[in-house]
Amino acid sequence: MKEYKLENIRNFSIIAHIDHGKSTIADRLLESTSTVEQREMREQLLDSMDLERERGITIKAHPVTMYYEYNGEVYQLNLIDTPGHVDFSYEVSRSLAACEGALLIVDAAQGVQAQSLANVYLALERDLEIIPILNKIDLPAANPERIRKQIEDYIGLDTTHAIACSAKTGEGISEILEAIIELIPPPKLPEETELKALIFDSHYDPYVGIMVYVRVISGEIKKGDRITFMATKGSAFEVLGVGAFLPEATLIEGSLRAGQVGYFIANLKKVKDVKIGDTVTTVKHPAKVPLDGFKEINPVVFAGIYPIDSSDFDTLKDALGRLQLNDSALTIEQESSHSLGFGFRCGFLGLLHLEIVFERIIREFDLDIIATAPSVIYKIVLKNGKTLFIDNPTAYPDPSIIEHLEEPWVHVNIITPQEYLSSIMNLCLDKRGVCLKTEMLDQHRLVLSYDLPLNEIVSDFNDKLKSVTKGYGSFDYRLGDYRKGSIIKLEILINDEPVDAFSCLVHRDKAEARGRSICEKLVDVIPQQLFKIPIQAAINKKVIARETIRALSKNVTAKCYGGDITRKRKLWEKQKKGKKRMKEFGKVSIPNTAFIEVLKID
């Protein structure tokens, strides 16, 4: 680390919608400041996972410290890269709390999108200095002036200092570096001398254990300090070393001081011991009050994960345990299902988080897994006054003891070209949405605000929105409140036996259509047997839909050549009795493909 000067430190973040060029601009900044040598440079350097590179998204926050000489002074520029997706909005808010400014990157052809809007509002709440960056000006469709007007009219940001650039060609990158130094203020001189550091992320390293990423607000942290976490009131730990991101995590001599960004290692064993947003202080001279804004991260979406081969259960357990080391938001609980065997009930921050975990299990651990349909947490008030919170259809109580049920709702902002307005309104109506307001973003695009049940969002809302807007629509959501809903348990019976893996909680108005589509799908995927198999959808033991898999026909009279008809009748009667007995005692084997196909039903 170079000479410490508080007034020469700039802490900033980058806010951008998916595919607007955030990681590419970060690459150009690293190149221009010579933080990374040319031979070590690669695309999306800060995105370390293959999954991040392929999808073009940032999943984990990646800080990096750069040094840049300007007007004879050397400035320390700390970039705290953040995930852009709404699922990780709490992590984004804590990363922004560690900064004094942010770069708002907007595609000069596509314009402002929903997820960048959501994060801009988080930055404005923190009173950060926001510098608009109009990227991809090399594209033929780029229209920087139109995008400037969008930013001014809809977000209310002054675009006098907006910078037009092209991360691809490198045009405008030096102007961005100068704007960071000129416009983003240095960290404030702390009034306190006690250590107060904000945790904005953590990472498990197999060699050194847990690395805690911090922005020091006041005081300093160094090797040998005894520290504790204020919000969680945990036990004390000894700091074994402090480091900086240059751009790789590198241990340094000395200390991390007020305004600086870095990490420390201590004898911490689990990521769960370290909560994002918590305040670090010393045991000897503790700070009086913690930093504000801390809250526990609770999962929002739940799904069951089961191995296709039951012998892979221990491997799956190990895989989830390893993923949890770097993902404190992932919750895991062992569960069993009559039809799927042993597996895990997992909690996620949202649908993208769930998809990432599934994909990493398959890729990194080479496992074949089945996932049950995602569900949300329902609040059930019983007639005896007790309240239950359930996320699994198997935990649904007897309907006769339920007073009422409440479901979580979310506030949704959708940005779309005008021509798709009626299609989106029909989609939201089908999803039980309530329209709050419609605003013009510019001459061609609208912002629609809706309240929607979370259950409708986690299933297929994103896919359907992309479909009806030909890929041009984008949305973000934030959790709202619980509202009374007519949610019931739909059971699927195969050969009169309920199959728990197909059970789901649905709105009463959609139960019959959902039940019918599941029954029709199962008729196609369950192989025929020597007896008829009824497939039924039922609510509270009342059948609302039914399909039948016809029996395989076997010609038992094939060996009878002519002769008396009574011989044939005896054989037919015997076959009839045998089929009746098979229907009573026969087990229907459900192939794994059936579970996967049912999950694909809209």
UniProtKB/Swiss-Prot annotation:
GO biological process entries: positive regulation of translation
GO-annotated cellular components: plasma membrane
Keyword match Cell membrane: yes
Localization in the cell: Cell inner membrane
EC number(s) per entry: 3.6.5.n1
Entry GO MF terms: GTP binding; GTPase activity; ribosome binding; translation elongation factor activity
Alphabetical list of InterPro entries matching this protein: EF-4, EFG_III/V, EFG_V-like, EFTu-like_2, LepA_C_sf, LepA_CTD, LepA_IV, P-loop_NTPase
PROSITE patterns (UniProt xref): G_TR_2
Domain spans labelled tr-type G: 7-188
Domain of life per record: Bacteria
Keywords: Cell inner membrane, Cell membrane, GTP-binding, Hydrolase, Membrane, Nucleotide-binding, Protein biosynthesis
Catalytic activity: GTP + H2O = GDP + phosphate + H(+)
Binding site for GTP: D19, H20, G21, K22, S23, T24, N135, K136, I137, D138
Presence of the UniProt keyword Nucleotide-binding in the record: yes
Topology in membrane: Peripheral membrane protein
Entry's family note: Belongs to the TRAFAC class translation factor GTPase superfamily. Classic translation factor GTPase family. LepA subfamily.
Functional summary from the UniProt entry: Required for accurate and efficient protein synthesis under certain stress conditions. May act as a fidelity factor of the translation reaction, by catalyzing a one-codon backward translocation of tRNAs on improperly translocated ribosomes. Back-translocation proceeds from a post-translocation (POST) complex to a pre-translocation (PRE) complex, thus giving elongation factor G a second chance to translocate the tRNAs correctly. Binds to ribosomes in a GTP-dependent manner.
Name of the protein in question: Elongation factor 4
Annotated source species: Chlamydia caviae (strain ATCC VR-813 / DSM 19441 / 03DC25 / GPIC) (Chlamydophila caviae)
